[in-house]
Amino acid sequence: MPPIPTGPFTMPMMNGFVPKKIQPWIYVFFAFLFQLAGGMYAGAMPHVMGDMCIMREDVTMIVLCGVIGVNMPFPFLFRFKFRFTNRQLLITAALAIAACNWLCMYTESVPVLCLLSYVAGFFKLCGTFECLSNVQLWMTSKRDFTIFFPLLYCIVVGNMSLSPWITVHLTYIFQSWYAMHWAMTGAMLFIALMVYVLTHDFRFMKPLPLISLDWLGCVLWSALLIEIVFLFNYGEYYNWWDGRPFRVVTFMVPVTFYFALQRMRHIRHPYIAPEAWLYKRLLPLLAVFALVELINSTPKILQNTFTSGVLHFGAMSTSVFYLVEWAGTICGCMFVMFWIKVLRQKFTRLLTVGLMALLAYEVQMYLMVTPGLDIESLFIPIFCRTFGVAIFFTALTIYLEELMPFQHFFMGLTMVGFIRNGVVDTICSGIYSFSLRHHIAENFARAMPYDATQVILVSLKQLFGVTCIIATVVLLIFLVWDIQPVRDTLKRMPYWSVVGRLLRRQMSSGK
């Protein structure tokens, strides 16, 4: 086995003919492409619905299965890293995503598409982690999470806006939703080819066997999340409790949760350790993430209803919003790094700034719900929203790392992902959708001299107003709440060899 390299930053898996200065940039580019990929792309939703004759809820369900798939590999990532080489992992992830994209174009079954989207999301995170974990010393030579996470979220959260923007334009140019799938299939094959040519197999430690991995636990938690997403995604379509599928899935949720909980409590190496749930500040942290998702879910229902149903903007017109969101995300992530590393201010004040940005979005949208609004007027509110979301996601992830020891941190990321990766967002979207329908029906029933457009405007303004009140109350709570890191000196990321030895001791001791 080759010796572990010491000294300046190196990438020993790279072949000698690759210039050292561009080696880390190659992996950053690979991570960028991985984050663009998926199983189904929401930007092509109207074309997918028309071509496959399926409902909007079906396409949304397929997309959300991919989002859930992205969340589930976290507890397995280091086990994969210490069993396979970087070359093997990247080639496998790229080929798996390429296969899923190709199969999605020729599959008409919604359940199969959901499965393919989940698998694509699973390998998407595996590929991204393997790329960025190998350049972290280049990104921060001191293994500082307060530098690494803002830069990481520039790619991860930023590409959540770039991917639909690219999808909309490719679909418009080629007049087919296949365009993005072919583009991502080609991008993944390009990654596999470049990794095959530019790298070689390199191990920095003796490989660990893939034993004691709780695959069934992963399946149970995934099934639970998918069932919850199903309920609130299809709730309006089935008229909630009136639909038999809704009642069946509602019954399945506690059953699945029971089996997942019992497996977690009674096996030696569970998917999520019971101890990971016992940190006293974890529940408030999850509550803050849920709050952000509540405020951030208004664009999916209220803003889209306003721009499409009232202003009648098309997909190409509103695609510019994705670029504004991308700019807000980059600025928010960089602001977190500036706040922590340069200003060295409290976490509470940072989260307060983020919440003020989210509140600014809601207030501006409340005031702007008028017919005849030009599209440029929405740029500042959208920028404020994504700026605030980026602050919350980045700062709270840093705080989570401070809260939990490293052996539980990646489990914590999955637990946080239960909230931020589609589940709570879908719940909030379902609530907003039901509330909007209720307010529209109520305003029509009042027999006021309003036409349909005016009724929609009044209903939207009512819901934006309620959200403003909720955000204002929470802002007041933040102003009197003090959140500081668990320790004065923030932790550093351990070396991968140290993590590997820790995992080996845990496996040998049976703990």
Residue ranges and their predicted role:
Residues C53, T85, Y106-V112, F123, ...:
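Helix-breaking motifs and short loop linkers at transmembrane-helix boundaries and internal kinks
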Residues M61-R79, L125-L132, L323-V336:
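Central cavity-lining transmembrane alpha-helices of secondary-active solute carriers
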Residues Y172-A287:
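Hydrophobic transmembrane-helix bundles of small-molecule transporters
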Residues P2-G16, P449-K511:
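Transmembrane-helix exit segments and adjacent C-terminal regions of multi-pass membrane proteins
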Residues Q23-A37, A42-G43, Y271-H439, L463-A471, ...:
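12-transmembrane solute porter fold
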Residues N15, P19, A37-M55, V59, ...:
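Membrane-interface helix caps of multi-pass secondary transporters
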Residues M1-A37, G50:
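Cytosolic juxtamembrane N-terminal segment immediately preceding the first transmembrane helix
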Residues F74-F78, F82-W215:
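Helix-loop-helix hairpins in multi-pass membrane proteins, especially solute transporters
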